Design a protein with these regions (language model features):
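Conserved, structured C-terminal
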Residues: 1-230
Length: 230
């Protein structure tokens, strides 16, 4: 049976190179569960805050930043206290709150895709940059779409790539990408990268223009009146 528990779960994400150290100070895991240090990618542990009588939690080694990170899951009634405990535990490491703008910038820098931007049901997984999630070799059983996906993998038409833009003007979702007069791609996401100190973007581009070092132009206004070199 499937049960909708959306209104019974709150989530706090703690991300960054010090996240493990912070959680290790705060989280109690029973002997039957993996510790924070033992958690592998995409795995979770059932645990509590501080001790056996503490707030019950699920902590997963997941996130959307490209960094070492974890997500802490609890009942909504405990969420404010869990937040306060995390902030207190992370004082020494400089833990600070961050919102969606920071999260979006980090995931673009890491090349992580967002539904509605990099894919929307009109692209196959290989065009969307998540071909690794398609078990063409590891799953022998047939599944819906397997044959066509095998064909698309062998004959890709487009590819998701990263662009470095020249100048201070940013690109945004939907901006067209050109080589000369021809449109060869579209910007799916863009931001000013704090790490690189330059504007960057994710772009779905025709396969023949997807090699690193290829020079293109991002079209603004109508795509022709104004261009940004990339």
């Amino acid at each position: 049976n499937i049960k909708d528990s959306t209104d019974q779960i709150s989530n706090v994400s703690i991300q960054g190179p010090e996240s493990r150290k912070i959680l290790e100070k705060l989280i109690f895991t029973p002997p039957t569960q993996p510790s924070i240090a033992e958690l592998e990618w995409f795995r979770f542990t059932i645990c509590r805050i501080e001790n056996l009588q503490g707030i019950p939690l699920i902590v997963s080694r997941t996130g959307y930043t490209g960094e070492l990170g974890y997500e802490v899951w609890c009942h909504p009634k405990h969420a404010p206290e869990v937040w306060d405990k995390l902030m207190e535990a992370g004082k020494k490491e400089g833990l600070i709150p961050a919102g969606f703008a920071a999260l979006d910038k980090l995931r673009i820098e890491a090349g992580l895709i967002l539904f509605g931007n990099e894919f929307d049901g009109q692209q196959d997984p290989f065009e969307a940059g998540i071909g690794f999630a398609v078990p063409l070799k590891t799953k022998e059983d047939n599944f819906i779409g397997k044959k066509i996906l095998e064909e698309r993998k062998l004959n890709p038409q487009k590819k998701l790539v990263g662009l470095e833009l020249i100048g201070k003007e940013a690109s945004g979702h939907g901006d067209c990408v050109h080589v000369g007069r021809s449109q060869v791609g579209v910007i799916t996401s863009g931001c000013l990268s704090t790490t690189l100190n330059k504007n960057i973007a994710l772009c779905r581009i025709d396969i023949q223009y997807s090699e690193p070092g290829t020079e293109v132009e991002v079209g603004k206004i109508d795509g022709h009146q104004k261009r940004i070199s990339a």
